[in-house]
Every structure is written in structure tokens, then in C-alpha cells.
């Protein structure tokens, strides 16, 4: 028996009862959230620092509204995949908020190019107002939803008349609506022998031509976009933030979504040096300082520093994989660092290793328990959880939720943070786990001296 697609089921919906059923929620729950409590009363606003300076407003929905938005997001992602499969569409230009796409895949399209041109859409999320969201789902040839259903979707997604940054369903809706922009700009790029990609509001063109076409850049020295490009941006319902226009040639540092792309995908040397300096300060002074774009200093956290190390490590892994499959591996290899990582860590991995050692075995606020087997932490957690009344020093129970929280850290021996490659900072050979544990204990004193 033929089973209708999720897109067909969405198109068949005519009212809130049928949409609620498709989202697998009770219609009374949907009605209460949308029309009694109302979405504008269900957000918490906070700000985060922008890399370019200033602040970005984030609106986080409460649990009830977030649940509905997550369900809508998943439904629209499935519909998008069904549309792509039906029309044989290969999505390779939009990299923000897309599954299996990252800032790395976005930057890869512009690696080793003669000229890179970056532009930025101004007020990206506020550009998607209520009428635009509703109208898209009614008029778009792939959706053609009932007006009542399109209205409800816009009510779920919008705050104060536009899509808020922080909602689970804002990313997929922006990408759906931006598809026409991507199509037009991709066509423009191909016409003039360029590559194109978009990561949310960051748009990048690149070319190996001697000069970038006038249709894209009318004045390279002034970073002024071409008339045809500006017209296409306006035609799609957007405006440009001209303060972020940037033309970069291969003789200077070329960056795409914060990554350098001159020869290989990487972070800047300053980023790596600053990360190591922060770690050094943490080891010997007990804390480190982050400098905001506005010049203000604040104390950094372990999580923030771990994020920086993990990001550097992720790029190393990407370049190592590319080195193996590329015909010219020297373009990807980080010079000066050994790649025989089965037996030896390179300098970046050693720095990451040292930090993780500090975090788990020196600067840890809770006792860390090392186990032999991969499943041992699971068994220990279950045992401690079931005997929490007898061992209050190992577990506590939250008053409101009755959830039990461990007071110890069960070290997981999997993936990148395992006992083999991280804690044993200068591991020379691959041995059994028991031998590694003995080796780890023997080296503990020496390892501690490095961070004291």
C-alpha cells in the first residue's frame, strides 16, 4: 500500500487539528501555547558577543514552545529532503544550519583561489517577517499549503512579526526561503566563472581569474559589490551590510567564515598562539583571561578553552584525511608536525592532550574515576544511582526534579578523549589497556610536574 510522504501529509492539512496530529501533539496543547499563553510571552532574551564587535540578540523559547518548534523543524527538514529527492536537487551551496554541513565544508569551496569576495546580509533573521514566512508556504510551488496551516506555521515560528534567532525552526525556514537566492547567485557565479556558497548570512564568491568580474565587484579597492549582484540581493528581499564587504587576493590572508583558505583550511596562527597562551596561564596561574572585541577583559572558562582546542583538532583531522586522499597531499599537511599519530602525537595534539589531562586529572572539581572497560562507567553509574541513599558523597538528588546527579566524573574511554591518545601524552607504542593504565600511573608524577 502506498504511504504518503510527509510533504503530502502536510499539504493535506487544512486546520490546526490536522497539523497538530501531524506534529504528534494534542490540539489543546497547541492552542494553549499559541493563543492563550502566546509566543511573545514564552521567550528569554540574552546577548552574545559578535566576533566583529557588538552584540547579537538570542531569543530562547521556553520548553513548551520549543517542543512544538523542534517538531516543526524536523517536519520541514524531512519535507526539504523529499523535495530535493523528487527534483534531483544536490544541495552544495548552502552550508549553514544544514545536516552534514559545517563552516569547513563552506570554506572548502573557496580553498586555494586567486580572489575571494565576502559579503554579508544585513539583519538576516529580522528580514523574514510574518507575512513573508506565511506567504512562502502558500505560494511556493513545492509546498502550496492551505492558508490556515501556513498561518499557524508562521505563528509557531515568529516572534514580534519576524523569525527570532534562537528558535529551533528559524534555520530551516530561512534556508527554504533563501533557496531562490542561492539559485540566482549560483547561476550568476557560474556565468562569470566563479564559485559561490552561503553560510546563513555570510555569502562568498571566489575565482581563479586574474580579476573578479565587474558584475560581482565594481570597485575592488573600495570592496564595492557590482550592480548586478546588488540587484539580485535586493530582488530576493535582502540588503547588504557594506561594512563587511571584503575582497582578498591570494597574496594576502583569505578568510571564509573565520577560516583561512589560502592553501588549506586552517585557523590563523594568532588563534593557535593565543589558545596555547591561555592554556599556559591556566596551568601556572590557575586562570586565564579572554579579551572581548570592546577591549574588556573577563575570566575564561574550561569549556571555552576546550572548545578552542577541539576546534583546532577538528581542522587537523580534516586536513589529515584530505592529505591521504588528495593527489597533492603537501597542500594539506601542517608543516613541521608528524602525522604518524598512531604512535606519536603532533604538537597541536600534545597541547590538546595536556589541556585534557589538566581538566580531568588536575583542575577537576570532582573526583575522576578511570575504568578498564568501555561499559564499566555505565555499570558504575547504575550502581551508584540505585544506592544513592547509602552513598550521599557520590550522588545527590535534585529537590525539584528528583533527578540524581553524580558527584564524581566517570572518565569515558572512547573517541578522541580516550586514555590511549590523550592522557598518555607521549605514547610511543600501542599496547593493551591494562599496560596503558600502568603506564599512565607511572607517568602521572611527571605529567603533573608539567602543569604545576
Label each residue range with its predicted role.
Residues 138-153, 175-200, 204-212:
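Active-site palm subdomain of RNA-directed nucleic acid polymerases
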Residues 1-49, 58-82, 86-119, 124-127, ...:
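Right-hand nucleic-acid polymerase module
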Residues 197-201, 243, 364:
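Short Gly/Ser/Thr- and Asp/Glu-enriched loop/turn motifs at secondary-structure junctions
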Residues 119-121, 209, 373, 382:
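Residues immediately flanking
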Residues 54, 119, 163-167, 361-369:
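Glycine- and acidic
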Residues 335-452:
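Acidic, divalent-metal-binding catalytic cores of TOPRIM
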Residues 116, 197-198, 368:
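Hydrophobic "anchor" residues on beta-strands that sit immediately upstream
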Amino acid at each position: 500500500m502506498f504511504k504518503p510522504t510527509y510533504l503530502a501529509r502536510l499539504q493535506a492539512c487544512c486546520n490546526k487539528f490536522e497539523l497538530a496530529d501531524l506534529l504528534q501533539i494534542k490540539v489543546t496543547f497547541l492552542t494553549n501555547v499559541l493563543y492563550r499563553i502566546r509566543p511573545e510571552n514564552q521567550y528569554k532574551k540574552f546577548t552574545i558577543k559578535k566576533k566583529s564587535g557588538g552584540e547579537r540578540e538570542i531569543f530562547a523559547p521556553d520548553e513548551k514552545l520549543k517542543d512544538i518548534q523542534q517538531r516543526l523543524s524536523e517536519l520541514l527538514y524531512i519535507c526539504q529532503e523529499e523535495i530535493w529527492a523528487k527534483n534531483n536537487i544536490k544541495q552544495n551551496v548552502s552550508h549553514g544550519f544544514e545536516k552534514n554541513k559545517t563552516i569547513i565544508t563552506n570554506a572548502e569551496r573557496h580553498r586555494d583561489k586567486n580572489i575571494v569576495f565576502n559579503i554579508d546580509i544585513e539583519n538576516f533573521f529580522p528580514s523574514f517577517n510574518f507575512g513573508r514566512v506565511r506567504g512562502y508556504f502558500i505560494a511556493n510551488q513545492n509546498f502550496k499549503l492551505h492558508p490556515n496551516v501556513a498561518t499557524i506555521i508562521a505563528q509557531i515560528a515568529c516572534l514580534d512579526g519576524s523569525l527570532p534567532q534562537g528558535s529551533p525552526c528559524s534555520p530551516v525556514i530561512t534556508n527554504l526561503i533563501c533557496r531562490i537566492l542561492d539559485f540566482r547567485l549560483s547561476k550568476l557565479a557560474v556565468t562569470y566563472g566563479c564559485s559561490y556558497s552561503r553560510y546563513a548570512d555570510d555569502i562568498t564568491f571566489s575565482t581563479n581569474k586574474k580579476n573578479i568580474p565587474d558584475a560581482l565587484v565594481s570597485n575592488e579597492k573600495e570592496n564595492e559589490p557590482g550592480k548586478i549582484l546588488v540587484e539580485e540581493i535586493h530582488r530576493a528581499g535582502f540588503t547588504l551590510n557594506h561594512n563587511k564587504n571584503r575582497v582578498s587576493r591570494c597574496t594576502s590572508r583569505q578568510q571564509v567564515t573565520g577560516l583561512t583558505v589560502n592553501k588549506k583550511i586552517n585557523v590563523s596562527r594568532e588563534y593557535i598562539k593565543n589558545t596555547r597562551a591561555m592554556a599556559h596561564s591556566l596551568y601556572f596561574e590557575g586562570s586565564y583571561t579572554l579579551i572581548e572585541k570592546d577591549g574588556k577583559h573577563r575570566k575564561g572558562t574550561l569549556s571555552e578553552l576546550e572548545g578552542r582546542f577541539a576546534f583546532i583538532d577538528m581542522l587537523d583531522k580534516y586536513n589529515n584525511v584530505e592529505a591521504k586522499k588528495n593527489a597533492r597531499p603537501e597542500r594539506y599537511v601542517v608543516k613541521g608536525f608528524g602525522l604518524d599519530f598512531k604512535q606519536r602525537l603532533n604538537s597541536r595534539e600534545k597541547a590538546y592532550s595536556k589541556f585534557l589531562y589538566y581538566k580531568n586529572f588536575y583542575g577537576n572539581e570532582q573526583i575522576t574515576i578511570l575504568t578498564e572497560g568501555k561499559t564499566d562507567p555505565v555499570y558504575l553509574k547504575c550502581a551508584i544511582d540505585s544506592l544513592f541513599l547509602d552513598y550521599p558523597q557520590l550522588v545527590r538528588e535534585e529537590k525539584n526534579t528528583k533527578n540524581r546527579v553524580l558527584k564524581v566524573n566517570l572518565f569515558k574511554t572512547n573517541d578522541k578523549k580516550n586514555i590511549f591518545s590523550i592522557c598518555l601524552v607521549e605514547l610511543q607504542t600501542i599496547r593493551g589497556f591494562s599496560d596503558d593504565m600502568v603506564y599512565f600511573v607511572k607517568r602521572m608524577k611527571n605529567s603533573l610536574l608539567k602543569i604545576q
